[in-house]
Amino acid sequence: KVWGILGWNIHLYLAHANVTPPEPESSTKGLGLNWHQDTSRVNVEMETSPRPRLSVKVALFLSDLSETGRGNFHIIPGSQKRDALKFPKGEGRKAKMRGSMPVQVAPGTAVIFDRRLWHSASANYWTESRKAIFYGYSYRWLAPRGPCNVKKYWDDLDPIQKQLCRQQPVDVHRYTTPFDEDVPLRVWIEKHLGKEAIQP
């Protein structure tokens, strides 16, 4: 449950599909790692340490990644609290880092991760392309990082879906001071789980 992590004042701020084709037999790419945290300038301009969470991603893996070498998602557990990593000289961000691990999952598995988590894609040495869809959820006051083109379906969406698909409030102040009509997710949570579930 994304709202169990971020709360109810959220929307979908990005969505994208990633396809990693198989490497050719002659490939010298190795693991093909490139360690990073998401959201670029946020990691430079936030002055606190550790930096605030602000968003989470849901990675929906469509391919069978139950074995390594298939373009697996690599992570360093616990690294979301580390603003920087010390990379080995010569290898830099391509290095296999101590404590890192590939995520091995069956097709259809959803993995929720903090945007601050140091992670990487990897090279695919399987016979099939690795396919995954990433959904990023953030607070409504954080600007989106891509379009949400659902206009043709808008009338069929329920109020919570409209909130998640960035329905604009009548006043910009209501991104940070929302009314119930702006955040039907809050109304739903309170109805089903009680007032304590929507605090603070």
Question: Can you annotate each of these PLM segments?
Answer:
Residues 1-6, 48, 52, 76-80, ...:
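Short N-terminal helix-initiation segments at or just after the protein's N-terminus
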Residues 1-22, 42-53, 62:
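Signature of the catalytic double-stranded beta-helix
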Residues 11, 20-22, 26-27, 120-122, ...:
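Short catalytic/ligand-binding loop motif for oxyanion handling, primarily in non-cytosolic enzymes
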Residues 11-14, 57, 74-75, 112-113:
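A structural signal for short, well-ordered beta-strand segments and their strand-loop junctions
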Residues 15-17, 78, 115-117:
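Short, well-ordered beta-to-alpha junction loops that form the rim of enzyme active sites
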Residues 15-17, 58-60, 133-137:
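A structural signal for short, well-ordered beta-strand segments
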Residues 26-103, 142-152:
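Catalytic core of non-heme Fe(II) oxygenases with the double-stranded beta-helix
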Residues 82-117, 122-200:
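Conserved double-stranded beta-helix
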